[in-house]
Amino acid sequence: MARAQALVLALTFQFCAPETETPAAGCTFEEASDPVVPCEFSQAQYDDFQWEQVRIHPGTRTPEDLPHGAYLMVNASQHAPGQRAHIIFQTLSENDTHCVQFSYFLYSRDGHSPGTLGVYVRVNGGPLGSAVWNMTGSHGRQWHQAELAVSTFWPNEYQVLFEALISPDHKGYIGLDDILLFSYPCAKAPHFSRLGDVEVNAGQNASFQCMAAGRAAEAEHFFLQRQSGVLVPAAGVRHISHRRFLATFPLASVGRSEQDLYRCVSQAPRGAGVSNFAELIVKEPPTPIAPPQLLRAGPTYLIIQLNTNSIIGDGPIVRKEIEYRMARGPWAEVHAVNLQTYKLWHLDPDTEYEISVLLTRPGDGGTGRPGPPLISRTKCAEPTRAPKGLAFAEIQARQLTLQWEPLGYNVTRCHTYAVSLCYRYTLGGSHNQTIRECVKMERGASRYTIKNLLPFRNIHVRLILTNPEGRKEGKEVTFQTDEDVPGGIAAESLTFTPLEDMIFLKWEEPQEPNGLITQYEISYQSIESSDPAVNVPGPRRTISKLRNETYHVFSNLHPGTTYLFSVRARTSKGFGQAALTEITTNISAPSFDYADMPSPLGESENTITVLLRPAQGRGAPISVYQVVVEEERPRRLRREPGAQDCFSVPLTFETALARGLVHYFGAELAASSLLEAMPFTVGDNQTYRGFWNPPLEPRKAYLIYFQAASHLKGETRLNCIRIARKAACKESKRPLEVSQRSEEMGLILGICAGGLAVLILLLGAIIVIIRKGRDRYAYSYYPKPVNMTKATVNYRQEKTHMMSAVDRSFTDQSTLQEDERLGLSFMDAPGYSPRGDQRSGGVTEASSLLGGSPRRPCGRKGSPYHTGQLHPAVRVADLLQHINQMKTAEGYGFKQEYESFFEGWDATKKKDKLKGGRQEPVSAYDRHHVKLHPMLADPDADYISANYIDGYHRSNHFIATQGPKPEMIYDFWRMVWQEQCASIVMITKLVEVGRVKCSRYWPEDSDMYGDIKITLVKTETLAEYVVRTFALERRGYSARHEVRQFHFTAWPEHGVPYHATGLLAFIRRVKASTPPDAGPIVIHCSAGTGRTGCYIVLDVMLDMAECEGVVDIYNCVKTLCSRRVNMIQTEEQYIFIHDAILEACLCGETTIPVNEFKATYREMIRIDPQSNSSQLREEFQTLNSVTPPLDVEECSIALLPRNRDKNRSMDVLPPDRCLPFLISSDGDPNNYINAALTDSYTRSAAFIVTLHPLQSTTPDFWRLVYDYGCTSIVMLNQLNQSNSAWPCLQYWPEPGRQQYGLMEVEFVSGTANEDLVSRVFRVQNSSRLQEGHLLVRHFQFLRWSAYRDTPDSRKAFLHLLAEVDKWQAESGDGRTVVHCLNGGGRSGTFCACATVLEMIRCHSLVDVFFAAKTLRNYKPNMVETMDQYHFCYDVALEYLEALELR
């Protein structure tokens, strides 16, 4: 049977295998002496039993179940279950593909499994592992063939092991035969491609990809077999083609324990495929052994060194990273690192961090665990800001509870920090000491109570946050403690003046007012009196006074009586402690009980008997009575009884006779002797207490006086009354009358003679003046001019009145002859030191005579201005008197003098060319006519309406011309180029009264006029004039000329300027800016006559006054008119010239360069020991003298009945000419408000000065602000301050919004400090919302105490000026409203200081006088007092010193 089967197998093999293929090795277990292949096998020594090699032939007596043949067999019934035995095939080491075949037999008669036949493949003598193939069960009594496709090649070797494992049934047989090795692929088992090693990092997933070739059976299973024997089933098998398939074996999260050798195994009943062993290499990611090292720490960074020299794990290291987190923090952040040091940025200050190093090797999951951490803390950082939200929680009189926002780490930036609450306040009073304290708060505190404060004090508090790295100070917030009862009034502050029946009592505010004093209470009562008629103690009386009334006059008191006064102050919290003082009234003169002079009781030639009545003592008893006899003289004025007429020195008759006196004491009576009325005979020849009463002379008249005296404590009071008159005897009466009449006639004749003498002197003076005027240069005979003082004279620019006593003026005036003889002038004031003498350097055109500057040398030749015979020059010293005479003279004055210019004129006129003329053409005189150079294109184009005018001792110094018309502009610039003019003076606006007065002959930027290019280089705008600088270039010329145009814009459209202050400053500016070697100054207005003539006359006369001390206005005007017709057009212009020259002479040059200011000012305030005055005081007196008082007609609008209630006081009214009329209409036709528009230095109408709004005028005030675009309001008085019956009330909302008539005012924001409260308001017209709103800042200045002329602090005032200036610049330069109580002194001081500071910034000049004078031209009460004027200088000095420190 076996043989038959073997034959079948052989045939099959021969059919399937190559014909020449023979096994390379194997065992057939046959007995043939020459086997096909060598057979090498062995049995394992550790088996439980041994395989049996059997040979069963036919006929052999064997169990029926066994097949015939030679093979290896195991009888399961002979072994115990679980026992096993192994057959070890020979060691194989093949170079190429090969196949191992074997036959097996598994049979049990009852069908049970005899056991399991397993096949193992051991590689290189390694562990056995698990079976690569096994078969169990009963498969019949036939042989089955299986194949092993082992893909292990040389140099590796392997062994195949067959294992028989006895089943629990242990019945049946297991057979094994024909183990053969063939050098061709297996047909029944797949061959695996080479399996490569797999390297992964620990914890990562590994995957073996097993590629197999062959025909896979349906029951084929694939496994990944570990060398240790563990099998892993395939996750999936993917067929690449019909003979190739891929099995994938994933290994999840492998670790070092999974590192081993693995191979692929396919199992099927027909055989198994086994791959080579591949290694699963598991690398441990690296980890540093030591933590990183800290190199440096900062608030927001840490610099570390990685310290990775020693590691745990496998390399190589391909990446280094830093992992850091807050200590015990939930987050971590990783940064890659390239160097050994690394800086961690953007860390939180004062925070502990854990920092570890991560190392990474190649491959996924190659990053190792973080190394040991470095635990380090960053430094603290400077706090981000100061604590916020500082506010009060509770305010009491002496303590303040504050609270603020709690602080978080994001603010402190450090866990170690401190909050300090610092506060300061001023004690006030005379000490003016500032208390400063800082209190350190407890950790986490957001509330604190400051104790032991003073009531009603501004407490300036700020919070300071500090940590080790810095500090942040919060903004200072001001709180005010509540009021308390006031402290006591200091007893030493009580001052008093006792009179007889009145006491003037004055006191000072308590040193500790502890709030706003609302009233004072004064109680008084009599406690002692030397007058027995006074009941003591008397009733107690009480009066109350307002807070600003710290004095009182107590009347109807008793003389000689001591009163006890108590004075105490009150706040809203009640009364404070009273101050006590005792004041005794003076005793009063006794009083008499005589209704009229009584009739004598009797009279003789030598005596007269009178009735003496006792007097009544007032405050003291009568001490003595006296009878006084006075001889009546003819011319003596009649004595009226009174205390001043009494006789204080007792004179006996003998003493009076010896001294030649007319009165004597006839008797002295003790008070006790006259207790009731009694008769007394004057002249009874008796002696009374040492006084002889001699008989009276019959021929003389006598007046009899009765005198009573009271003496008390060194005081004496007298009262006397005339009680009788004794006439002379009748026979002596006629001679007396004749004598009286003779004396009266003599007096009349004396008065007449004196008047005649004065008249003769006056006529003599006039004759001398006329004779002196006949000389051609009459003014050269005048006394040598002297430095002119600013004499205090009353002067009104436009309305100068005659002095009250003309005769006295004439008497005081010295004639020219007398001045020459005496060598005197009213200017030679003792101790006068003119300002100019203090300056260093030479005299320039800007430093004129005025103010005593040294006169420049004057030549005589070449001057065209000659004094006439009937119109001689007037000395500067006599100019005021001359103007007064000319304005008030009835026969000959300015009117007649002006009209004389037109008498006998031969106005030869040249026919005007069309392009040069105007509607009323003005012809120029040929001799002085300016001729233009002819042009090639038009040789006749040489005419221009312009004339040369001489200056003072300077020929052709001016060119007077008309304002250019469009067709005349090119000729105008031709003339400027031809004459090399450096200055153009323009005294007109382009359009006036709706008519074009002058064409705009200059460009906005640059333009060509013919062949001349004009470029505007610079524009400087001031309040009353504009200076434009032009560059002139002409085609064909290489030269470039610079020309300045001085455009005076303040000349009114009608008449003349109200004041000359601005025009005089303008003339000085032109003089100073024109180079001495330049060509003529071109001057034009509209027609080139009236205004132009005024300018030239003023320029010339200022030079003449400076050089010679005289002015000759009349002849100067006459000479000008000979050069150009109608140079002075109106009498008003002629008078204005005189007034302007007078103002210049009186005021002088008051400008000081800033580099000379300190030294000059020091000299100005020096007190002259002779005059006990200073230059500064004299300058202020000059300012007062030239300040024009307002007439009633000038304030006609303010005086209208409907406007009276809009004025706080009728003494301070704005003139009509500078009123800002209200524009917004609220239905009321009245558009008046008590306010005045005034100039600053650089801007016209820059200020609006007004008074503190009344309750009824508050809507008008806000209309004024809105209508005139006022962006700043400066408040210089305090609320509730009142010098009148009108209180100063708050006129703004705070907070919120409020409607004031048409205007809605909304509070936007506010800030405050100890000097200034600043508020921002939004103002809009509620009836015209489409116009938008106006943003206004309100500056309430706190450092100007009531009843003080000047602010408390110059520094604070400068701060106010700076803040206003800064806001004005930010808000677009709107107007500024300035107000105080009455719109006078304080407001004027502010405007003057602002003007002076502008002057310093623009031109480095200081001129306080000019600033004050300009303001007073609008309102005479501006800069009212000497202290305020002095303060303006101090502010300028403080400002300049502050600039030096920058």
Curated annotation (Swiss-Prot):
Domain MAM, residue spans: 25-188
GO molecular function, a single term: protein tyrosine phosphatase activity
Keywords linked to the UniProt accession: Cell adhesion, Cell junction, Cell membrane, Differentiation, Disulfide bond, Glycoprotein, Hydrolase, Immunoglobulin domain, Membrane, Phosphoprotein, Protein phosphatase, Receptor, Repeat, Signal, Transmembrane, Transmembrane helix
Glycan-carrying positions: N75, N410, N685
Transmembrane regions: 750-770
Assembly behavior: Forms homooligomeric complexes which mediate cell homotypic adhesion. Interacts (via the cytoplasmic juxtamembrane domain) with CTNNB1; may mediate interaction with the cadherin/catenin adhesion complex. Interacts with KIT. May interact with AP3B1.
Name recorded for this polypeptide: Receptor-type tyrosine-protein phosphatase U
Organism: Mus musculus (Mouse)
